[in-house]
């Protein structure tokens, strides 16, 4: 779990702070693909310190992580949503209150089960 220490208290003793310059590699051809990297990083990446609160807390699932396979897809994070009904780019998003509740209770190795979408 990663968190913004300038915005939220450490949600769990094992949570790691998101530092200035922390990035997440989404460059599938690079050796650091699907890993936390530091700026400057010349390949495709996502900034973990955002101006909005979406990444104030990030829970990292084991989807194609920590050993990434090219073509299997980027990491799936659990993070804060923009609001009800707003999609993510492949992650799982929660209200801030629900994310804080989850973050305060999970441990490394906690199993996350994502059910298939219900048919209309």
Annotate each predicted stretch with a short phrase.
Residues 1-88, 99-120:
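Cell wall/extracellular polymer interaction/catalysis modules
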């Amino acid at each position: 779990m990663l968190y913004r220490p300038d915005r939220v208290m450490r949600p769990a003793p094992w949570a790691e702070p998101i530092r200035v310059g922390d990035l997440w590699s989404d460059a599938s051809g690079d050796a650091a693909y699907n890993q936390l990297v530091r700026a400057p990083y010349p390949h495709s990446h996502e900034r973990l310190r955002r101006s909005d609160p979406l990444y104030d807390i990030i829970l990292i699932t084991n989807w194609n992580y920590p050993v990434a396979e090219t073509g299997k897809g980027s990491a799936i994070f659990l993070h804060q949503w923009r609001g009800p009904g707003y999609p993510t780019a492949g992650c799982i998003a929660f209200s801030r209150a629900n994310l804080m509740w989850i973050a305060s209770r999970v441990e490394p190795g906690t199993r996350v089960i994502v059910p298939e979408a219900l048919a209309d």
